A protein has these predicted regions:
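Beta-propeller fold detector
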Residues: 24-25, 63-72, 125-135, 197-204, ...
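Conserved blade-ending motifs and adjacent loop-strand segments that build the rim/top face
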Residues: 219, 347-370
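Generic anion/oxyanion-binding catalytic loop in active/binding sites
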Residues: 4, 25, 78, 174, ...
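Sec-dependent N-terminal signal peptides
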Residues: 2-15
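A structural signal for well-ordered alpha-helical scaffolds and beta->alpha junctions
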Residues: 3, 111, 178-182
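Acidic, Gly/Ser/Thr-rich repeat motifs that build Ca2+-stabilized beta-propeller blades
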Residues: 16-169, 224-227, 232-244, 306-344, ...
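Beta-propeller domain segments
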Residues: 75, 84-86, 164-350, 386-389
Length: 390
């Protein structure tokens, strides 16, 4: 716990020497890809598309037969700023034995849905009749839906991220309320036939006025979070409102953290300049953003703009890129810049990458295969694998 408290008192400084890596195209021809997952035994690549499909990649292109197609069930994103659709997927820790996996989507009635599904007798196709809905609640707007899913590497519980419900400035103050799921990371135990139970170690377990599923709260729109596979620490990319993007941190096993939104944006008071900021957990990284950037030049690099929408990534624990080992890799959806945080030395490096550096990219996510190697998901339809730089 002492390490946890010290960590948030340190200042992260950008502008260090760049780290050089390379990348190669491993999948293309995709339609609005948001996430990449890997079969826990074969390492075959599965890509989640916002349009409602999960596709399996063969020889760099989607296979002809879809693993899953729920495009008839989801609210399709049709307008700029509409973030609905199929948003998340994760394999059950025992997927090889039970065939279970979990998805998060926004349905046609504008409800966020978390459900469990199972593969059919053909392991390349899902049994659509197997869907068991675990969580379903109405979204007030069409953005800030969150939808990311991860299993904790140490406790085996399912963690689920949801945004504040959308619009501007969290108009209902959802993220500071504990009687709803908005602006939270949830933690549930899915090791039951009935759907899920709430772990007794959750901070609000058995509290009738608070949602027992909540693990952490005070988030605006957690766009991808992940666990350091070595120690179970959580890193969260939380998208800012107008001025600040942030990376938040939860030490393994520490629940009940309040990251401050909509009282705080990054390290700064948001609604009231005289807010009492020491009541909240500050981000380990913040960087300035321009909320209007995307309206003028999506995905084009500008030296005077840091970005407009953080994309959380992973702590690299692979064996092929020595200069990234132990560093947290993240990006920005609007600029496509790659960064690496050395959170032991409190230094952020910009990553120099020749394949991605000269073109338009909208980095919607990162992926980690069974060998702990990292992948970059470009919303424009391409998946890249990160490699050692020459």
């Amino acid at each position: 716990m002492f390490k946890y408290l010290i960590f948030f008192l340190l200042t992260i400084v950008f502008g260090q020497d760049n780290l050089v890596v390379e990348s190669s195209i491993v999948a293309k021809g995709l339609n609005k890809p948001l996430l990449v997952r890997f079969h826990p035994e074969t390492n075959v690549m599965y890509v989640v598309q916002q349009t409602g499909e999960i596709v399996i990649i063969n020889d760099k292109v989607p296979s002809e037969n879809l693993f899953l197609d729920i495009s008839d069930k989801i609210a399709l994103s049709i307008m700029p700023g509409d973030e609905r659709g199929l948003l998340g997927m994760v394999f059950d820790p025992n997927y090889v034995q039970n065939g279970y996996f979990y998805i998060c989507y926004v349905d046609k009635d504008n409800h966020s849905v978390v459900s469990r599904m199972q593969v059919s007798e053909n392991p390349l196709i899902v049994d659509k009749n197997s869907e068991l809905i675990l969580i379903r609640f109405e979204q007030p707007f069409n953005n800030h839906n969150g939808g990311h899913l991860e299993f904790g590497p140490k406790d085996g519980y399912l963690y689920i991220g949801f945004g504040d419900g959308g619009s501007r400035s969290d108009p209902f103050g959802n993220a500071q309320k504990l009687d709803n799921f908005f602006g939270t990371i949830l933690r549930i135990d899915t090791n039951t036939d009935s759907g899920y139970t709430i772990p007794e170690s959750n901070p609000f377990y058995n509290n009738k006025n608070k949602k027992g599923e909540i693990w952490s709260y005070g988030l605006r729109n957690p766009w991808r979070f992940s666990f350091d596979s070595m120690n179970g620490d959580i890193f969260i990319g939380d998208v800012g409102q107008d001025s600040w993007e942030e990376i938040d941190y939860i030490e393994s096993g520490v629940g009940g953290t309040n990251f401050g939104w909509n009282i705080m944006e990054g390290n700064h008071c948001y609604l009231d300049s005289t807010c009492v900021s020491n009541q909240y957990i500050n981000p380990i990284i913040e960087y300035p953003s321009d909320a209007n950037y995307m309206k003028s030049l999506v995905g084009r690099k500008q030296t005077n703009v840091s970005g407009c929408s953080v994309t959380g990534g992973y702590v690299y624990r692979g064996s092929n890129i020595n200069n990234l080992y132990g560093k947290y890799i993240f990006s920005d959806f609007c600029t496509g810049v790659l960064w690496a945080l050395d959170y032991q030395k409190d230094i952020v490096y910009e990553i120099t990458e020749s394949v991605l550096s000269d073109d338009r990219h909208m980095i919607s996510s990162f992926g980690e295969d069974i060998y702990k190697e990292l992948y970059i998901v470009d919303f424009l339809g391409v998946i890249y694998k990160m490699k050692k730089g020459e």
